[in-house]
Amino acid sequence: GRDAYIAQNYNCVYHCFRDDYCNGLCTENGADSGYCYLAGKYGHACWCINLPDDKPIRIPGKCHRR
């Protein structure tokens, strides 16, 4: 696993305000835990700890939300 911003489709982060939202999102996806990283590179976004390698993470480049 890896520590990273979990990504939605099209390389977009999950925006957040509360740690419990991110912890739930991350653990549902197999991570050990997660929290809301405030005022980071992508604003307030969910950061996961030990997220499985098969789950999408935010990579450099644009968020292509449709």
From Swiss-Prot:
One of its GO terms (cellular component) is extracellular region. InterPro entries: LCN-type_CS_alpha_beta_dom, Scorpion_toxin-like, Scorpion_toxin-like_sf, Scorpion_toxinL, Scorpion_toxinL/defensin. Residues 2-64 form the LCN-type CS-alpha/beta domain. Keywords: Disulfide bond, Ion channel impairing toxin, Neurotoxin, Secreted, Toxin, Voltage-gated sodium channel impairing toxin. Disulfide bonds join 12-63, 16-36, 22-46, 26-48. Belongs to the long (4 C-C) scorpion toxin superfamily. Sodium channel inhibitor family. Alpha subfamily. Alpha toxins bind voltage-independently at site-3 of sodium channels (Nav) and inhibit the inactivation of the activated channels, thereby blocking neuronal transmission. This toxin has a strong analgesic effect when administered to mice by intraperitoneal injection. This is Neurotoxin BmK AGP-SYPU1. It comes from Olivierus martensii (Manchurian scorpion). The gene is AGP-SYPU1.
